[in-house]
């Protein structure tokens, strides 16, 4: 008997970018594909959304350069607060040094802006499949 898990539900995604028009566009695109999406316009606001209930989101999609708290520090603090979800860094032309900074943070993908929506949706769909498979293995 298979057990229904929460990952058979649409992914719960938090998108973070200080470019409000872009983050709204990304959120709307993900919602079109059935994902449940919230967004924040800076790292500090995102951390406020994550910290009280770190299990609320399955996926964090973050920019790198943002006011108050950059993408790297957001991931560090989110992990420290108990966030165990997947992470995609969606940022403009990261330097090799910035890419290296994300190396030890269990980041599933780094996508350079500008990217077409198919690339982002493809990575999100792959991560959802991984979560489904992991949930099924855990339930077995």
Which residues are covered by each model-predicted region?
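Receiver (REC) domain active-site loop signature in two-component systems and cognate sites
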Residues: 66
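Conserved phosphotransfer cores of two-component systems
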Residues: 51-55, 77-84, 105
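Acidic, metal-coordinating helix/loop segments flanking the phosphotransfer/catalytic sites
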Residues: 39-59
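Two-component/phosphorelay signaling modules centered on CheY-like receiver
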Residues: 20-38
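Non-catalytic signal-transmission and effector/linker regions of two-component phosphorelay proteins
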Residues: 1-14, 24-27, 116-140
